[in-house]
């Protein structure tokens, strides 16, 4: 907002002292004004025409105080870049990725940030030049299968499977009809070690777990086909971390299963508010065999202890 108009008193004169203009100077100024009026073309009365635009040489240099004052007076600098169009609306984002409305409160504040706009722009650019997995409508499939208020267990993965037809938006899960990957086979073995009466899964689709309150979330949501880790530089991890943090703040007493160093570094829930379980990664290359992981029984024990129903770890 503009401040009060500057004082009419010439700079450097104390209050009460008037500037006296010599009579000769005043007369000279009056004669000059009369001559200028006489030289004006006929019909150029007050308000008849706009004052001429000063030449480029007469205009103040850009960046000087005079230029700043001129910009303020006119309201804008004609050479300034156009304003930032801003973040995408929630409706546009949700429509593009088929995001469930239940996650709006956790996702909307994040997608409005500059880094998220750059992330989404880079993702769209990659889609034009390479085969990106999973399909666009499955990148946020986890939001459609598990509402925030239903989350009991959070399992953190790294990035999607990079083989054709495998990834569909849930960590460690593959579509029906796709061979069960070795890591998922080890997960199933650990489940059956704790619950031996469960039938052996005939497929690797974990949508049933997701519908029962198990959030299966990768830290990187996309990948280039055949190139594991290729989309980690896009910045998905920052978005996922922020969403998990908001989930931790709004949902107490969650169970976190953090398998391997990557998951344990990417996600750091408060152990005073949540049950945090750590183990080696289920990959067959891990030093500690994952088949001995007791997390599935420990998670259910904690859920029962805190007054909630245990998770059914069977796969439909």
Curated annotation (Swiss-Prot):
PROSITE patterns: U_DNA_GLYCOSYLASE (PS00130). Its EC number is 3.2.2.27. Its main location: host cell. The keyword DNA damage applies. It is found in: Host nucleus. InterPro entries: UDG_fam1 (IPR002043), Ura-DNA_Glyclase_AS (IPR018085), Uracil-DNA_glycosylase-like (IPR005122), Uracil-DNA_glycosylase-like_sf (IPR036895). The active site is at residue 159. Keywords: DNA damage, DNA repair, Host nucleus, Hydrolase. One of its GO terms (cellular component) is host cell nucleus. Residues 36-91 are annotated as: Disordered. It catalyses: Hydrolyzes single-stranded DNA or mismatched double-stranded DNA and polynucleotides, releasing free uracil. One of its GO terms (biological process) is base-excision repair, AP site formation via deaminated base removal. Residues 36-79 have a biased composition (Low complexity). GO terms for molecular function: uracil DNA N-glycosylase activity. Excises uracil residues from the DNA which can arise as a result of misincorporation of dUMP residues by DNA polymerase or deamination of cytosines. Therefore may reduce deleterious uracil incorporation into the viral genome, particularly in terminally differentiated cells which lack DNA repair enzymes. HAMAP family: UDG. Belongs to the uracil-DNA glycosylase (UDG) superfamily. UNG family. This is Uracil-DNA glycosylase. It comes from Suid herpesvirus 1 (strain Kaplan) (SuHV-1). The lineage of its organism: Viruses, Duplodnaviria, Heunggongvirae, Peploviricota, Herviviricetes. The gene is UL2.
């Amino acid at each position: 907002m503009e401040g009060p108009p500057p004082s009419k008193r010439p700079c450097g004169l104390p209050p009460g002292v008037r500037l006296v203009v010599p009579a000769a100077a005043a007369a000279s100024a009056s004669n000059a004004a009369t001559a200028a009026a006489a030289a004006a073309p006929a019909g150029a009365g007050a308000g008849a025409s706009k004052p001429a635009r000063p030449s480029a040489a007469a205009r103040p240099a850009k960046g000087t105080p005079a230029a700043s004052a001129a910009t303020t007076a006119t309201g804008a600098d004609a050479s300034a870049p156009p304003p930032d169009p801003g973040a995408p609306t929630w409706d546009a984002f949700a429509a593009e990725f088929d995001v469930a409305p239940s996650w709006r409160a956790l996702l909307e504040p994040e997608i409005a940030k500059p880094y998220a706009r750059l992330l989404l722009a880079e993702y769209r650019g990659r889609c034009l030049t390479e085969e990106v997995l999973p399909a666009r409508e499955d990148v946020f499939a986890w939001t459609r299968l598990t509402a925030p208020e239903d989350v009991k267990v959070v399992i953190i993965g790294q990035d999607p499977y990079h083989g054709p037809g495998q990834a569909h938006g849930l960590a460690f899960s593959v579509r029906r009809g796709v061979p069960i990957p070795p890591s998922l086979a080890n997960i199933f073995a650990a489940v059956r070690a704790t619950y031996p009466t469960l039938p052996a899964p005939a497929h690797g689709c974990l949508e049933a777990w997701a519908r029962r309150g198990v959030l299966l979330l990768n830290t990187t949501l996309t990948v280039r086909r055949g190139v594991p880790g290729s989309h980690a530089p896009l910045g998905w991890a920052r978005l996922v971390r922020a969403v998990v943090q908001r989930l931790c703040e709004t949902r107490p007493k969650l169970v976190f299963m953090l398998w391997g160093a990557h998951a344990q570094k990417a996600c750091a829930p408060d152990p005073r508010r949540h049950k945090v379980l750590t183990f080696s990664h289920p990959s067959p290359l891990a030093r500690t065999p994952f088949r001995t992981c007791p997390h599935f029984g420990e998670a259910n024990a904690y859920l029962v202890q805190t007054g909630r129903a245990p998770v059914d770890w069977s796969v439909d």
